[in-house]
Structures are given as C-alpha cells and as structure tokens.
Amino acid sequence: MQFDVTIEIPKGQRNKYEVDHETGRVRLDRYLYTPMAYPTDYGFIEDTLGDDGDPLDALVLLPQPVFPGVLVAARPVGMFRMVDEHGGDDKVLCVPAGDPRWDHVQDIGDVPAFELDAIKHFFVHYKDLEPGKFVKAADWVDRAEAEAEVQRSVERFKAGTH
C-alpha cells in the first residue's frame, strides 16, 4: 500500500499548522502549550476521512524535515491508536515509499523501540497544559491494522460519511 501524505507540521516544530481544506492554504492553528516539539513530520493522508471527521493523520519518518504543504509518497508500517477529547484520533506511522534506505522497515516491530516510545510520549503529553484537552488511550498497532484503517478511511471519504 502506498499513498500521498500532505505534510502540515515539520519535525521539530512547536507551531501547529493545519491545511484549510476549503482554501488549500496552510493556517497556523496554535502554538503547543507544552515545551515539546513534533517528533516526526506530521500531516494527513489524501482522500481519507478519519473517525474524527478530518482526513486520517499520518506521521512520516524522514531523514530531514520538509515544509508544510509538501506531498510525500509514503507507505504505512504501523499506527498509533489514540483517543482524545474528540474521540478516536489515530495516526498512521509511515516511511518514504520507494526509498531503499527504509527497505528494512516493513512493520512496527522494525522501528526502534526508543523511537516509538519518544513518539508515544509526545502524543500522550503534548496537550497536557491546554484547557479542556486530553489524551486518554494510546498504543501502537501493526501494519496490517494500519492498512485496514487507511482502507476504511478511504471508503468513508468516498461515501462522504464518518
């Protein structure tokens, strides 16, 4: 499975950018309240609809951060199942598609445990200081479950429902 991910937030940023789906422009949504930075490039999978009514979120492991609005051809290796104040907010973990430097990463177990722990720590705590926001459940699942969620999100998008 391969798809395009639109990057909204480069790795290392505290600014939370979002693509305005009506205008196509990148908007500064907010600054993170916690003194933390995004641990990967972060965006969404084109032509999907997640459980939260937004396109399905994606995290892309890249050797160097890219800019907001850049499309990255990616493939899933796992998914971070997360529940926040709005409900399900899953994040598909991806690597660049067609890049031989990532051939050894095929499933979640191929990603170093420390990297997974760092990403999990960020998403469990990045909303800690924001009034009314929280994360209550979060864990990693494998590539098969990630691919199934991507497929469900594509079907929701095509049906226009969530």
Curated annotation (Swiss-Prot):
Transmembrane segments: none annotated. Pfam families: Pyrophosphatase (PF00719). Catalyzes the hydrolysis of inorganic pyrophosphate (PPi) forming two phosphate ions. Antigen that activates dendritic cells (DCs), increasing their expression of cell surface molecules and augmenting their production of TNF-alpha, IL-1beta, IL-6, IL-23 and IL-12p70. Rv3628 mediates these effects by binding to TLR2 and activating downstream MyD88-, MAPK- and NF-kappaB-dependent signaling pathways. Rv3628-stimulated DCs induce the expansion of OVA-specific CD4+ and CD8+ T cells which secrete IFN-gamma and IL-2, and the generation of effector/memory T cells. Thus, Rv3628 polarizes DCs toward a Th1 immune response and promotes protective immunity against M.tuberculosis infection. The active site is at residue 89. Mg(2+) 3 binds at residues 84, 89. It is found in: Cytoplasm; Secreted; Host cell surface. This is Inorganic pyrophosphatase.
